[in-house]
Regions:
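Hydrophobic alpha-helix immediately C-terminal to the catalytic Tyr-X-X-X-Lys motif of short-chain
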Residues: 157, 161, 165, 195, ...
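Amphipathic coiled-coil/heptad-repeat helices and related helical stalk/stem segments
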Residues: 42, 63, 191-192, 223
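N-terminal Rossmann-like NAD(P)+-binding domain of SDR-like oxidoreductases, especially those catalyzing
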Residues: 1-181, 231, 311, 315, ...
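Conserved GTPase G-domain signal focused on the G5
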Residues: 185
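C-terminal substrate-binding subdomain of Rossmann-fold SDR/epimerase-dehydratase oxidoreductases
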Residues: 16-19, 199-334
Length: 334
């Protein structure tokens, strides 16, 4: 099959593209290669995707004409949409980047799928859509009407837009709410990367909400396994579904939403302890108040995902952090 993987130079997109290539698929990857973080890291990921079955095009999702041309020329079987302007905190200062990439860019993906009869669109949503929810674990049955960041609002909007296109045009869509993904080849703006860099340089790390936070940290290999399994299960329309009695994660249209998380929330301080053990050094900690747009805790109910594909993430934080540190030291030749 021929896949489009958006954000192919990004953390998750790179790993997904690599897995699809290993399984013998043809993959077209796109990425705008922006400088939100180190472009050389993005290029290094792309270099590892070198294969006759992989073709890369530098393209911005918001380029309406370029995206339409790409879809018309390639006639993809399936689309795995992972490109987005990421980061909760960055959205506080750079809101228009999120409107361009996460809203207009996403509309171009939907239009491409519509006009070329793509058989399945799988797209990245986010655990951030749960916003002010306090009930744990977060379930796809819960309300997601109270986001606390613009990033989260754009991800919720993506789910709504997907439903509209599934309803109007019969496009099968599956949204995946990722929970704090980490691992080798990760993003430099994420905590594990920043903490590792600071500790190896002898600098202190900023610990928000004085360490009193929990995250459902999910290792990249587990994310990849789940995504690859999910893309093979194409949602079907369900004429018996109703708003009154049906799940909000499904529809009468061929539309589904799932959580992908480890289902084992970890205290931030325990995450830091795992990093200290992997590095063999103690972190100097700046204890800070919580940042605007952050939530205290996240935890994923992944039973519906397990019911669908028979898989639950397995990797412990201790193992995952150790793997990240080994990659980091090798990549930066430390």
């Amino acid at each position: 099959m021929k896949f489009l993987v958006t954000g192919a130079a990004g953390f998750i997109g790179f790993h997904i593209a690599q897995r699809l290539l290993n399984e013998g698929h043809d993959v077209v990857g796109i990425d705008n290669m922006n400088d939100y973080y180190d472009v050389s890291l993005k290029q290094a990921r792309l270099d590892r995707l070198s294969s006759p079955a992989f073709h890369f095009q530098q393209l911005d999702l918001a380029d309406r004409e370029g995206m339409a041309t790409l879809f018309a020329a390639e006639q993809f079987d399936r689309v795995i949409h992972l490109a987005a302007q990421a980061g909760v905190r960055y959205s506080l200062e750079n809101p228009y980047a999120y409107a361009d990439g996460n809203l207009m860019g996403y509309l171009n993906i939907l239009e491409g799928c519509r006009h070329t009869k793509v058989k399945h669109l799988v797209y990245a949503s986010s655990s951030s859509v749960y916003g002010l929810n306090r009930k744990m674990p977060f379930s796809t049955e819960d309300s997601v009407d109270h986001p606390v960041s613009l990033y989260a609002a754009t991800k919720k909007a993506n789910e709504l837009m997907a439903h509209t296109y599934s309803h109007l045009y019969g496009i099968p869509t599956t949204g995946l709410r990722f929970f704090t993904v980490y691992g080798p080849w990760g993003r430099p703006d994420m905590a594990l990367f920043k903490f590792t860099k600071a500790m190896l340089a002898g600098k202190s790390i900023d610990v928000y909400n004085y360490g009193k936070m929990k995250r459902d940290f999910t290792y990249i290999d587990d994310i990849v396994e789940a995504v690859v399994r999910v893309q093979d299960v194409i949602p079907q329309a369900n004429a018996d579904w109703t708003v009154e009695s049906g799940s909000p994660a499904t529809s009468s249209a061929p539309y589904r939403v799932y959580n992908i998380g480890n289902s084992s929330p970890v205290e931030l301080m325990d995450y830091i302890t795992a990093l200290e053990e992997a590095l063999g050094m103690e972190a100097k900690k700046n204890m800070m108040p919580i940042q605007p747009g952050d939530v205290l805790d996240t935890s994923a109910d992944t039973q519906p995902l397990y019911d669908l594909v028979g898989f639950k993430p397995q990797t412990s934080v201790k193992e995952g952090v150790k793997n990240f540190v080994e990659w980091y030291k090798d990549y930066y030749q430390i």
